[in-house]
Amino acid sequence: MMSYLKQPPYAVNGLSLTTSGMDLLHPSVGYPATPRKQRRERTTFTRAQLDVLEALFAKTRYPDIFMREEVALKINLPESRVQVWFKNRRAKCRQQQQQQQNGGQNKVRPAKKKSSPAREVSSESGTSGQFTPPSSTSVPTIASSSAPVSIWSPASISPLSDPLSTSSSCMQRSYPMTYTQASGYSQGYAGSTSYFGGMDCGSYLTPMHHQLPGPGATLSPMGTNAVTSHLNQSPASLSTQGYGASSLGFNSTTDCLDYKDQTASWKLNFNADCLDYKDQTSSWKFQVL
């Protein structure tokens, strides 16, 4: 600023102005002679001054102006310094209290963390205990075939009749027929007219012919020759095998049933994964629901 004022007079609108003219044009602008220090010097307190300040802080944390002036006279410091010291001292006290609280919480937290694994173990054991009864009850159901589990049967079929009450329907496909274990896997289909009467079996039987196009997609381990030979059998031969063609209303042109020969044994594995059939050559897979 001083160098700016020491410049020679310059013309403003053709008038030669001096520094006094600048003061007249800008009377509100002050030009300090010495630059102001932006940072104050740190105040170093002596031991005696700190003792006096600590004694007053022990009495009250918020002294009024009169108390601050009195202490400032005692320790020979400005009152503003005393006010700033009390402000810093209160902040330091709050910080110490927070550290103590955090330290107490840190001491209590490990105990909670130690007790939490026990709770997790107990919760895991509780969940395992909750899940074990369904698994134990589901295996005997499949093994003993005490009750039908109609997950693959159509939803519109009425409840099973008495001859089919002991059949395991986990192997049922899209047609309403069940495999009975009592006959020693002979597949004696009970063709009762009371159960199959008035039903259109074509809607349930025809899709199976398209789903079993090749030898890889057949569910039974017998070959394709046996399949074609059984598909071309007459109703008389179907009735001799215990299928009840007369009561079911099947004719000789129905080529969508996957039957077996009496000489060929189609053994059913009633295990926990009896619904998981995976053929390498077909994409028709049953998954456990």
Swiss-Prot record:
Keyword DNA-binding on entry: yes
GO cellular component: cytoplasm; nucleoplasm; nucleus; transcription regulator complex
Subcellular location: Nucleus
UniProt keyword terms in alphabetical order: Developmental protein, DNA-binding, Homeobox, Nucleus
Single annotated GO MF: DNA-binding transcription factor activity, RNA polymerase II-specific
DNA-binding region(s), residue ranges: 38-97
Primary location group: nucleus
Gene3D superfamilies associated with the record: Homeodomain-like
Tissue: Brain: restricted regions of the developing rostral brain including the presumptive cerebral cortex and olfactory bulbs; expressed in the developing olfactory, auricolar and ocular systems, including the covering of the optic nerve.
Listed InterPro entries: HD, Homeobox_CS, Homeodomain-like_sf, Otx2_TF, Otx_TF, Otx_TF_C
Function: Transcription factor probably involved in the development of the brain and the sense organs. Can bind to the bicoid/BCD target sequence (BTS): 5'-TCTAATCCC-3'.
Protein name in UniProt: Homeobox protein OTX2
Lineage, top ranks: Eukaryota, Metazoa, Chordata, Craniata, Vertebrata
